[in-house]
Amino acid sequence: MDQGGRSSGSGGGGAEQGKYRGVRRRPWGKYAAEIRDSRKHGERVWLGTFDTAEDAARAYDRAAYSMRGKAAILNFPHEYNMGTGSSSTAANSSSSSQQVFEFEYLDDSVLDELLEYGENYNKTHNINMGKRQ
């Protein structure tokens, strides 16, 4: 393996299987990305299918950095500022067209407030969200 955690692979050029950590080439030419979650006994976490191996590798890097922080072995470590404790700026440095959203758990009272706000908004603006006839 080289410094970036990539295996050297064998065979011809191009983006052969094993070039990037967490990336596999599908038979039809797309690239699948997944990572194992050590918090869930190595359970596979599906990250998606991508047009390029580099996009799939960046998805893996975002997930790895999110899970493991500075201890993560990345495909593109130079894209992450390892000197800071913030992972949000690291994910933004990627040129990928994919966006990553982090959701925070909020208790049911917040959901109830949001639903009530939506209902009140719809009433004051005469928006009918009922079934169409």
From Swiss-Prot:
GO terms for cellular component: nucleus. Residues 19-77 bind DNA. Keywords: Activator, DNA-binding, Ethylene signaling pathway, Nucleus, Plant defense, Transcription, Transcription regulation. PROSITE patterns: AP2_ERF. Its main location: nucleus. InterPro entries: AP2/ERF_dom, AP2/ERF_dom_sf, DNA-bd_dom_sf, ERF_plant. This is Ethylene-responsive transcription factor 14. It comes from Arabidopsis thaliana. The gene is ERF14.
